A protein has these predicted regions:
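Bacterial lipoprotein signal-peptidase II cleavage site
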Residues: 21-35
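Early extracytoplasmic/lumenal segment of secretory-pathway proteins
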Residues: 54-135
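Extracytoplasmic ligand-binding site segments that recognize negatively charged/polar headgroups
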Residues: 72-85, 120-261
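A ligand-binding cleft/hinge motif common to bilobed small-molecule-binding domains
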Residues: 131-136, 258, 264-282
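Periplasmic-binding protein-like
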Residues: 168-170, 195-207, 230-239, 278-303, 316-339
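A bilobed periplasmic-binding-protein/Venus flytrap-type ligand-binding module shared by bacterial periplasmic
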Residues: 171-178, 215-219, 293-306, 316, ...
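C-terminal capping/gating helix-and-loop segments adjacent to ligand/active sites or protein-protein/ligand interfaces
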Residues: 323-382
Length: 382
């Protein structure tokens, strides 16, 4: 039996306005999203008109038949895309007759190349939190919010060119064999090599959470993370630099933590979950101070099937459909009224979010990518 997913009030009130996916309870001081990130988001959408409400109801429950249409859907492959296929693509195809051709190499650069060459072959693309902002307006079609239920999407996750399709968390995962039965309380323990000896895993990417978690460990409140104090973050990272083991992709992070190559790791919650539940390794998640983020759906400018793409995106973000991939992978919905399987709810980032959770300021990170990346590369090679 399924039940309606009740997201924490903090999220519905705007805690996810910084968007871009229980191992220990956390006390929750009152915090709000950072001012710079909140300011980059549009105001809440106006109530839908009667005509818009009717169009939305139709696309959610009886999307138009479109036999003969083939949509090219690009995502990231693996278990993630398999969950999207089972949760969305296959049911939508059965309802509408739309066929899907898939690409498993979603890339911002590929979107840019296709659009600028005038040879657009992708129709719907799942992108990370670093894409789909106003800075990318020349590459994307504005979304059709007469169809997409903008008022039901977490605040800040439905903007002009992108709408969040799944949520996940950047979390602290730990190998219980390596921590001697002790439970790290947050990122400060990740940086405490005396209390918790051992190697530390982290993503080899400048904007994947390495600076944010260093600042959280150093006492910066989630609401005060941006603009990032890079000097302070690097000083904190220097305290564990000799013990850091970088991972280039999610599969490697799962392998490292499961094998005990690292005692703790900065990871995506789905990979940590898989290490425990699929690989059957002694791995747990500390949800305290997770960084909540999302993936988004976009339509490249010049898509040959723009209207069909809008219908599909609208259907995936409807309350009755949005949580379907979470039956196959522990990534959560963005629709606040989403219906979720109770067997998976406890493993979702969005369910475990509270006032201690942090949020990427996507607009700030995009605007400052060059400086952040330079600081990261200089630190790593010193």
């Amino acid at each position: 039996m399924k039940k309606r997913l009740r997201m924490p009030a903090l999220l519905i009130a705007g805690g996810l306005a910084l968007g871009a996916c229980t191992g220990g309870a956390s006390t929750a001081p009152s915090t709000e999203p950072s001012a710079s990130a909140a300011a980059s988001q549009p105001a809440a959408s106006a109530p839908a008109s009667p005509a818009e409400s009717a169009a939305l109801a139709q696309v959610c429950t009886a999307p138009p038949k479109q036999d003969g249409v083939t949509l090219t859907f690009a995502s990231y492959g693996g278990a993630y895309q398999e969950a999207q296929r089972k949760g969305w693509l296959e049911p939508y195809s059965a309802l509408t007759g739309v066929k899907f051709q898939e690409s498993e190499d979603s890339s911002n650069a590929t979107i840019k190349t296709q659009v600028e060459s005038g040879q657009v072959t992708w129709d719907v693309v799942d992108v990370g939190n670093d894409f789909g902002l106003d800075a990318h307006a020349d590459l994307l079609e504005p979304l059709d919010y007469t169809l997409i239920p903008q008022a039901e999407i977490l605040p800040g996750f439905a903007t002009t060119y992108r709408v969040g399709d799944i949520t996940y968390g950047v979390v602290l995962a730990y190998n219980t064999d390596k921590t001697g039965g002790k439970v790290p309380a947050g990122w400060a323990d990740y940086f405490d090599l005396t209390k918790f000896p051992g190697k530390r895993g982290t993503w080899d990417y400048s904007e994947g959470g390495i600076f944010e978690t260093a600042l959280l460990a150093d006492g910066v409140a989630p609401k005060d993370l941006y603009p990032l104090d890079l000097d302070r973050a690097i000083k904190k990272l220097d305290t564990i630099k000799s013990e850091i083991v970088f991972w280039p992709g999610g599969a490697k992070s799962q392998e490292q933590i499961g094998a005990g190559e690292v005692a703790m790791s900065l990871m995506w919650n789905g990979r940590a979950w898989s290490a425990k539940n699929v690989d059957k390794k002694p791995v747990e998640i500390q949800w305290n101070q997770q960084i909540v983020t999302a993936d988004y759906l976009v339509v490249p400018k010049g898509s040959p099937n723009k209207d069909a793409a809008m219908n599909f995106i609208a259907w995936t973000t409807c309350a009755n459909n949005n949580a379907a991939p979470s039956n196959y992978i522990p990534y959560g919905p963005t629709n606040v009224n989403a219906v979720a399987n109770p067997d998976t709810v406890a493993d979702l980032s969005v369910t475990n979010a509270d006032a201690n959770s942090a949020y990427f300021d996507d607009a700030w990170l995009v605007d400052n990518f060059a400086a952040v990346d330079e600081a990261y590369n200089n630190w790593k090679t010193q």
